[in-house]
Amino acid sequence: MRLTIDHHTRYQFSEPQARVVQLLRMTPADHVGQTVSDWRIDVDCDARLRDGRDGYGNLTTMLYIDGPISAMELMVRGEVLTDDSAGVVRGCTETLPPLFFTRVTAQTQADEAIMALAETVVGSGTHSADRAVALMAAVHDVITPRPGRTEKTITAADAFALGHGSVRDCAHVLIAAARAVGYPARLVSGHCLDGPNAASHSSAHCWTELYIEGEGWISLDPSTNRRPRDSYVRVAIGLDASDSTPLSGTRRGGGIEALDVDVRVALIQTQG
């Protein structure tokens, strides 16, 4: 597929800010099944941008704005060519061993209910892609994805108890369940042409990768109950969403910050 992505973020501050610093994880990298043909980041005010990589190997951009500033708009646009890799992850920059991704975070702590689900599905058998897919399906059956962007951060255990959550919450539940039975697991942020948030244009997408010994990393999307294919664009990874969120940062100044996000993914039709 040839996909275009437009990710606009608008900040409005109730009081002028003396300085704004943002860490952007919004630039996808090339790997098997994904080629970035065009990508750019624009800001509607004077700003300094510095590209780099974080500890996970994600492409990053540091954004620095000196005030006073009362509003700003960040525009990320690009075009990505994707091929169907059947949910198998290859050719990515890997800076950390799979064992690192067995670490439990506050967002991905499994409670007794999540552990019981994982043990019922996976049991004590050898880890395999089939068991990982079965675990994804089990998580999909017990937590309903709610489209849209959410400001409230809840844990995997809370989302599991509620029985619904954002695509981020669905991913956190699968990560918690997978780690509970020994799978290295990580969260992926990116974009999806036909995901739960496609109609609302309100946020990017999240899914999960699990490591299978002898096979490598495989992609699983518990919000759609499928293995990501060529309608997905992979951008960043982390232990949980806090490590791979598209935007994070600080500001120097008082008042309230209002954020408006519009994300659109489109398929470029080709003649042939």
Sequence positions of predicted segments:
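Secondary-structure boundary elements
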Residues: 80-84, 90, 95-165, 173, ...
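Short acidic/polar alpha-helix capping motifs at helix-coil junctions
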Residues: 3, 23-26, 136-142, 171
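A broad, low-specificity signal for short, low-complexity segments enriched in glycine/proline
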Residues: 1-4, 32-41, 146-148, 166-172, ...
